[in-house]
């Protein structure tokens, strides 16, 4: 078992490397840990636009949410998306639950993607 001192030191090194204070890093760990407890199929990952929620072993939550939106109105968009085979029905259900809990976060990610895509297409 690793000592608390070594773990705290490693967290401090990681925080400094990421440009975070130790207290910011610990606050983020607590927030993400609480969200993982609430949504066990969800993890968090770094990327060029910051940290975001993603399916464990799968795409980002916002991507799956956007795919569902892009299917338009329908009786069972989740079943339709699952039939494509990219994500399973349990993964889609996990995305829907996370989106219901944190709608502003997911909508902001979708909006950012759509704005970036529109800007790239305009070039």
Report each predicted region and the residues it spans.
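Intrinsically disordered, low-complexity basic tails/linkers immediately adjacent to helix-turn-helix/homeobox/MYB/SANT
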Residues: 48-58, 111-123
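Short, basic interhelical loop/turn and adjoining N-cap
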Residues: 20-21, 82-94
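Short Lys/Arg-enriched helix C-cap and helix-to-coil transition segments
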Residues: 39-45, 105-115
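Short, charged amphipathic recognition helices of the HTH superfamily
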Residues: 21-23, 71-83
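Short, amphipathic alpha-helical "recognition" segments used to contact nucleic acids or chromatin
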Residues: 58-75
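Short amphipathic alpha-helical segments
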Residues: 1, 11, 18-31
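Short, solvent-exposed alpha-helical "recognition" segments
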Residues: 34-38, 74, 95-108
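Short, positively charged interaction helices/loops
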Residues: 35-61
């Amino acid at each position: 078992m690793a000592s608390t001192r070594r773990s705290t030191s490693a967290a401090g090194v990681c925080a400094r490397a990421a440009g975070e204070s130790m207290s910011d890093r610990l606050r983020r760990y607590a927030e993400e840990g609480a969200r993982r407890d609430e949504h066990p199929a969800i993890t968090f990952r770094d990327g060029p636009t910051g940290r975001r929620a993603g399916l464990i072993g799968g795409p980002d939550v916002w991507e799956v949410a956007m795919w569902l939106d892009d299917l338009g109105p329908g009786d069972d968009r989740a079943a339709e998306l699952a039939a494509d085979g990219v994500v399973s029905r349990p993964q889609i259900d996990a995305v829907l639950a996370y989106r219901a809990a944190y709608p502003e976060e997911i909508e902001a990610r979708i909006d950012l993607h759509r704005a970036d895509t529109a800007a790239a297409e305009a070039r």
